[in-house]
Amino acid sequence: MSPATITLLFLLFAIVMFVWEKIPLGVTSMIICVGLVVTGVLDFKTAFAGFIDSNVILFVAMFIVGGALFETGMANKIGGIVTHFAKTERQLIIAIMVIVGLMSGVLSNTGTAAVLIPVVIGIAARSGYSRSRLLMPLVFAAAMGGNLSLIGAPGNLIAQSVMEEMDMSFSFFEYAKVGLPILICGIIYFAFIGYKFLPDKSGEKDSSYDEQKDFSNVPKWKQALSLIILVLTLLGMIFEEQIGIKLCITGCIGALALILTGVISEKNALKSIDLKTIFLFGGTLSLASALQTTGAGEDIAKTVIGVLGENPSPYVLTFVVFMLCCILTNFMSNTATTALMAPICVSIAQGMG
């Protein structure tokens, strides 16, 4: 069996397991990574290169930087302050979407949602509004806000890693060129139309999210310093070219500063790292390498281009890829979809010249 065929079989396995999710996504990725070595498709060094990728290091660092903001209660406080000024339900929906969208752009969108869900539930209880009508806009804003920057969502960095293999990359806020208009349109939609269709579920049962964490014992200096270090870290990333320090190193400096100053303990710093994302990221990069080195990605690209006819329009091809990703992401996570589609899309682009 040729290396290209083996790679395509692993790709099929990945699609099935990512949709089925009977075993964790990270474990599936590691099975693929190890399998590519055992079958001789990739050598050990190439297969596991994804785990020392600069974007994985950036992931780890920003998990800690974001974790400090969550651990100290600063994220909670920011959310509470902004929503405090909203007087009506519609104003509250807009305020929630603005703060969640912006925070998701510079922190983990999943982490932002998890931290602000109890805040919003508390606001709903105090104001008498239905929590379901406030939580749905929060989730949408977190998803849209993740597309404001390179670090907003795991999929963004996966695409960055694939681009870097071709000596190309996205700048820190390049995603915002598309992500910001989407977020703004989403907020406007909910403000004028969407709020009418939000579910109003009465008799909502208590959940683990009803219990808000008490941050009153956290020193004010820790909260302030966590925010200051986050801002300085982001500024360092924005001005990467001017200061000559790579994004991952800037992130590491921010993470180390938080640990050394005692803002976050080493134990909590390690706890804030999402290992599932790291394993998914590192493992699927080995599949991306195999698709490229064996020519399997090129075969897929030729098939797709062939189906669309000779010299297909780039706009048509973009639409097809867009719709395919939209369909896939309803059956598997956004991160898994990006991990599968990014190398294939690159092969298609190269095939079209």
List each model region and its residues.
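Membrane-embedded alpha-helical segments and adjacent helix-loop junctions characteristic
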Residues: 27, 34, 38-130, 272-277, ...
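Short, structured coil/loop segments at alpha-helix boundaries
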Residues: 1-2, 73, 88, 156, ...
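Short, electropositive, low-hydrophobicity segments enriched in small/polar residues
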Residues: 25, 44, 70, 149-150, ...
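Juxtamembrane and boundary regions of transmembrane helices in multi-pass small-molecule transporters
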Residues: 6, 127-140, 146-158, 162-216, ...
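Transmembrane alpha-helix interface/packing and boundary motifs in multi-pass membrane proteins
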Residues: 14-23, 99-109, 140-151, 236-242, ...
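Hydrophobic transmembrane alpha-helices of multi-pass small-molecule transporters
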Residues: 1-60, 64, 177-302, 318
